[in-house]
């Protein structure tokens, strides 16, 4: 199966966008999952709901909210451009942001479930033996949560690969800049004679998703085996 240059461009851009989206959202995913599991504070239920909103909102709505907040004239985007010269709307950076926002709830949910399975008594025992909060987190909590972190990361990566609605609303469908696999397929489907190209990208998407899930299962199994030793 031979891809054309524009198709390769879409595949490579999708991999770049998905990888960066996961890379930048992972620290926040771990933090918010830990916050929801280990802390009690006013507004916790509200925070939980806000974090999971992208799962239930139409992607176009999320893209519109990003556009009005992070666009050149948005209340956040305008300041980012004036102070740092950074723009998100209609650029690959915006595609990364849209993918990160849409995939974030899946990441948080997987990590949260793993954290809920960690025995709090292990952390308490380490604290009574003199270990500090950060040392307990990095030597006990994080290693025991690693399988969930891996699963959440791969799920977020796979979700980012398939992101379309928020992306096309926020950053449009610019070849070489924001045209990811779903956007390229959308264009090809609407183009006479583009069915074969859309089919090739469809096969690539399925293959990437399957590979991601298989790698996730393999890494999670290795992590569980090491944690059980």
From Swiss-Prot:
The chain crosses the membrane at residues 17-37, 50-70, 84-104, 137-157, 202-222. Keywords: Cell inner membrane, Cell membrane, Membrane, Molybdenum, Transmembrane, Transmembrane helix, Transport. GO terms for cellular component: ATP-binding cassette (ABC) transporter complex, substrate-binding subunit-containing; membrane; plasma membrane. The keyword Transport applies. Residues 1-16, 71-83, 158-201 are periplasmic. Residues 38-49, 105-136, 223-229 are cytoplasmic. GO terms for molecular function: molybdate ion transmembrane transporter activity. This is Molybdenum transport system permease protein ModB. It comes from Escherichia coli (strain K12). The gene is modB.
